[in-house]
Amino acid sequence: MENKQATLELGTKPVGKLLIQYALPAMIAMTAASLYNIVDRVFIGQGVGAMAISGLAITFPFMNLTAAFGAGVGVGASTAISVKLGQKDYATAQNILGNTISLNLIIGIGLSIICLLFLDPILRFFGASDQTLIYAHEYMVIILLGNVVSHMYFGMNALLRAASKPKQAMYATIFTVVMNVILDALFILVFKWGIQGAAIATILSQLMALMWQIKLFSNKNELLHFKKGIYKLKRKLVDNILAIGISPFLMNVCACIIVIFINNQLVRFGGDLSVGAYGIANGIAMVFVMFVFGVNQGMQPIAGYNYGAQKLDRLIRVLNLSIIAATAIMVTGWLIAMFLPYYCARLFTTDKQLIDLGIKAIRVVMFCFPVIGFQMVITNFFQCIGKVKISIFLSLSRQLLILLPLLAFLPMIWDIDGVWYSMPISDFAAAVIAGVVMMWYMNKLKRQHQEQLKVKS
């Protein structure tokens, strides 16, 4: 079976070729996903106005918070499936597939109902002012009505990668981006639906991709496919999915908490346009962050399979290659941020004040990018091999343990500059912590590897 053969290659094919095979489609897909938000911001900034960008920026932590639940399930399930495939436990992998579908349906519908009931208070808490609330409200109503579609779409893409179909996952993501661009232009520029048009374009493009994903998993000739009896939730499988997925879930939740706090501090010390500037900087930064997420997603099935198969030499090899790739990506982002910030900001708006604020925001937010790729890969590595506590600690160290106190303290000294400078300082400190933890664990891994070689000899 072709799909089964592709899965077995995770333990035999050269690691470098495997990483390119899995990471390149994921990088393209994740970068395309980051363009999703950029496209919305560009069309809204050019077609609606500067204040609409600030309103849209308020919604992103909200959207990420709801997506955190789907990401937790998706990453947890894909990692669990990869490990089970490495152990050749195909029946359990099949049941994990079905349980993932059920979990995403339940969570997607439940979150939509709760958030719609308390939408305006939530947006106020996230930093919306009287000027930006109307834009944020109009956008989020439509996004929440289609939330179950988003959960299913992102969850199915994670499952495609675990099922040794990284190219199909890439195609699905690229399709949604292309359709989003087309529909944004149609709904915003032609139909004049404003920020609501951007939200409708997002949900419709994801729905079309989801229909194709469902068709792929309906093929009974595939190793992993839909069939009767796999959708009933099983406590052991759900616990395993959630235990692995708790790290990315907490990472996303912490990121949302931080962005909420950043938005509120920016409004307090710099006004609504500062939130818009942060939205612009964050959009540019996320292009490169998503590249690294792509590397991480490419590493995940390789690391998970070889950890399950106890092939430690291949595990260490894929980790080292992933760190090199991530660092190269983030250095490229740093160079663009330092030398071409005007052109990045100008893409989103013609408002001179917002452009000036955006230039500063881009340079500060991306200042420590050369070390962030390393930190991201290390955190993901521990997640891939099931070391949940270490992964959670590294996730929390940057966001809650370092950045949050800095955001509270530094503005008292440097006003609005204190908000901006908190970000690169926490980035650098988190990278140092990740390096120390990794040195400790690598020594442990190398000892295990040497013992393994002695047993073989």
Predicted stretch roles:
Residues 1-23, 81-148, 190-245, 303-368, ...:
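Short alpha-helical transmembrane segments in multi-pass integral membrane proteins
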Residues 10-47, 61-76, 80, 105-112, ...:
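N-terminal transmembrane alpha-helices
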Residues 21-40, 142, 176, 205-209, ...:
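Transmembrane helical elements of multi-pass membrane transporters/channels
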Residues 24, 40, 77-78, 118-119, ...:
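Hydrophobic/aromatic residues in alpha-helical transmembrane segments
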Residues 35-54, 123-130, 186-193, 256-283, ...:
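Helix-terminus/linker motif at the lipid-water interface of multi-pass membrane proteins
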Residues 53-113, 150-169, 277-341, 372-391:
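Small-residue-rich hydrophobic transmembrane alpha-helices
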Residues 65-68, 180-185, 210-214, 286-290, ...:
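Hydrophobic transmembrane alpha-helices of multi-pass small-molecule transporters
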Residues 74, 143-161, 172-177, 198-211, ...:
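Short runs within selected transmembrane alpha-helices of multi-pass transporters and secretion channels
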